[in-house]
Design a protein with these regions (language model features):
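N-terminal strand-loop-strand
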Residues: 2-42, 55, 70
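Generic intrinsically disordered, low-complexity segments enriched for polar/acidic and small residues
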Residues: 1-3, 34, 76, 92-93
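Active-site segment of metal-dependent pyrophosphate-handling enzymes
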Residues: 9-11, 55-59, 67-99
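Hydrophobic alpha-helical positions that pack around
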Residues: 44, 58, 62
Length: 99
């Protein structure tokens, strides 16, 4: 039998959304609505459901939090520091989105 500090890590996605208005590059942030970071600015994202891939979860969160659909999305990094989230063990798969 094995004993792990974090036997069931959660998986989340974050979307770094880039937009270009012809002169400047912009990044879209959303205001967090729940603790522990309520009121803070963050990249749109959230927890992956058990029946979806990371990309499906990223697209779902993107639509839920921003209303965006049909944008170009590409995975670019995985954040896995065991202590990066005070709530629980979380692994985040990050995507960049071009609009």
């Amino acid at each position: 039998m094995y004993s792990y500090k974090y036997p069931h890590p959660s998986v989340t996605t974050d979307c770094v959304i880039f937009g270009f208005d012809g002169t400047k590059l912009h990044v879209l942030l959303v205001e967090r609505g729940i603790d522990p970071y309520k009121g803070k600015w963050a990249f749109p994202g959230g927890f992956i459901k058990m029946d979806e891939s990371c990309e499906e979860g990223a697209l779902r969160e993107l639509k839920e939090e921003t209303g965006l659909t049909g944008a170009y999305i590409e995975q670019f990094h995985t954040f896995s520091d065991p202590n990066r989230d005070p709530r629980e063990r979380v692994i985040t798969v990050a995507y960049y989105v071009l609009v």
